[in-house]
Regions:
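Solvent-exposed, non-transmembrane regions of integral membrane proteins
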Residues: 1-167
């Protein structure tokens, strides 16, 4: 194995009940997909804007807050600096709330934006889009074959099929 990669779908934002952790609505939650073109969307009665999108980030604790900075290492998280504005129809009501939202990783905890005492804006776990392994296959005939194996795209070498089953 030379290199393994996981490509992920863009982050999804949703609103949950802070006390139960259940999405709202529970059976079929509303989501906002934050792809590279996303600037603004609506979730329930909240206008959501992304002020900053850091695909690979780590938290930095300052004297009074936690902010995120670019960090291209293992355990990095996708961090979104979001603004959530309560709305009544097309009219803004109240003050916008601003904060970082992440889904967390094995290294860093998730970060939510508290909207009310009962509601929080959260990022769902990132879903894998593609797994790929760049491999070297050494044959009995002294060949070194370099290939990329993906799920449902096996590599055939000397009558053998090499599969990528998952990560």
């Amino acid at each position: 194995l030379e290199k393994f990669t996981i490509d992920e779908y863009p982050p999804k934002l949703l609103i949950i009940n802070s006390k139960t952790g259940k999405s709202i609505p529970a059976k079929n939650p509303e989501i906002v997909l934050v792809d590279k073109h996303f600037r603004e969307g609506k979730l329930l009665k909240w206008r959501i804007r992304v002020r900053q999108n850091l695909p690979l980030a780590a938290p930095v604790v300052t004297s009074d807050t936690v902010k995120y900075v670019g960090w291209g290492s293992s355990g990095a998280v996708t961090a979104l600096l979001v603004e959530a504005q309560p709305m009544e129809g097309d009219r803004a009501v109240g003050k916008p709330l601003v904060g970082w939202v992440t889904c967390g990783s094995y290294l860093f905890p998730f970060q939510e934006l508290k909207l009310t005492k009962d509601l929080s804006l959260v990022m769902a776990r990132r879903e894998p889009e593609r797994y790929a392994s760049r491999i070297h296959v050494y044959t009995r005939s002294q060949k070194n074959i370099v290939a990329t194996v993906e799920v449902n795209k096996p590599v055939s070498v000397d009558g053998w099929r090499i599969y990528q089953l998952s990560y």
